[in-house]
């Protein structure tokens, strides 16, 4: 079929030369053309199947390689989506952890502030109580020392009822 197409194509190409009226009897162009067509036909006959099978195998190899690359691309896209999803989850988890840490820090701060306030109030109370006790102790010691000095001086005489009344008024 191909040979027939080649012969017809060759004849169509040579037809303008025949129409011009040139004398080509002195040349061997027709024999050479027929030899070329015969050579091309024989070459085609022997090599066509091998050439077709070679081209088919190359086409199959290329399509296989393309399918492999597309499969790898699909796997890569899926991995990318998976990793992006994991990254989003990690970001959300980090935000949650930070939020919880801030809440916990605030709670701990409030707790220690309250405890410190209570401790300060207790210290103030205790120091006031200690100061009151010390004041009473000092008053008592002062009264005792004054009474002792007065008893020893013998200038002033007190009976027991007078001592009790003075002590009640001063303490």
UniProtKB/Swiss-Prot annotation:
It comes from the Bacteria. The keyword Membrane applies. Pfam families: ATP-synt_B. Keywords: ATP synthesis, Cell inner membrane, Cell membrane, CF(0), Hydrogen ion transport, Ion transport, Membrane, Transmembrane, Transmembrane helix, Transport. The chain crosses the membrane at residues 2-22. GO terms for cellular component: plasma membrane; proton-transporting ATP synthase complex. It is found in: Cell inner membrane. The keyword Ribonucleoprotein does not apply. One of its GO terms (molecular function) is proton-transporting ATP synthase activity, rotational mechanism. F-type ATPases have 2 components, F(1) - the catalytic core - and F(0) - the membrane proton channel. F(1) has five subunits: alpha(3), beta(3), gamma(1), delta(1), epsilon(1). F(0) has three main subunits: a(1), b(2) and c(10-14). The alpha and beta chains form an alternating ring which encloses part of the gamma chain. F(1) is attached to F(0) by a central stalk formed by the gamma and epsilon chains, while a peripheral stalk is formed by the delta and b chains. NCBIfam families: PRK08475.1 (NF006292). Belongs to the ATPase B chain family. This is ATP synthase subunit b. It comes from Helicobacter pylori (strain G27). The lineage of its organism: Bacteria, Pseudomonadati, Campylobacterota, Epsilonproteobacteria, Campylobacterales.
């Amino acid at each position: 079929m191909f040979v027939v197409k080649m012969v017809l194509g060759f004849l169509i190409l040579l037809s303008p030369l025949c129409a011009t009226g040139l004398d080509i009897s002195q040349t061997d162009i027709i024999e050479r053309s027929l030899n070329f067509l015969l050579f091309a036909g024989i070459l085609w006959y022997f090599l066509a199947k091998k050439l077709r099978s070679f081209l088919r195998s190359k086409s199959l190899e290329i399509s296989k390689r393309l399918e492999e690359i597309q499969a790898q691309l699909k796997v890569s896209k899926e991995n990318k989506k998976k990793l992006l999803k994991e990254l989003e989850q990690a970001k959300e988890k980090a935000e949650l952890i930070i939020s919880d840490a801030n809440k916990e820090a605030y709670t701990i701060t409030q707790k220690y502030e309250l405890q410190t306030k209570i401790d300060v109030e207790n210290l103030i109370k205790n120091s006031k109580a200690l100061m009151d006790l010390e004041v009473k102790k000092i008053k008592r010691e002062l009264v005792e020392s004054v009474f002792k000095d007065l008893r020893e001086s013998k200038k002033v005489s007190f009976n027991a009822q007078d001592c009790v009344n003075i002590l009640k008024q001063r303490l």
